[in-house]
Amino acid sequence: MKASFRDYINTLRKNDELLEISKPVDLRDVAALVAQSEKALLFKNLPGYSMPVVSGLLQSRKRIALGMGVDYGNIGDKLGKAMDKPIKPKRVANAPVKEVIHTGKKVNLYDLPVPVFSIMDGGPMITAGVVIAEDPEFGINAGIYR
């Protein structure tokens, strides 16, 4: 299955798993709103930023399964097959990720709308990678560890 991040967002839309918010939302409120939502949230209007933020993409089993293109019960099989036959990465000349490229002095990380996840955080952090681990007794788990 070939898919892009945009395809995944559209899949969430079609399956009523995405709530799009057009009214202005302060970036400091994003994490709290995501925690309260049963859907993934797409914030289209963050004052001070020129790009949207989407969050909550992996907060439900249904959304994970939709992203993988399988029913929930088949996630383990799909992951197992992918791990048994990994696909080598390849460079491509054109891709959506290459639509906007900043280099040199044009790079400014403060342009990115990076939320604060907890009141105890020292400030905004780019974090929250997904770790997939397999335990012989309990099976496969996907988690976010900071």
Q: Model-predicted segments: where are they?
A:
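Extended, highly charged
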Residues: 1-146
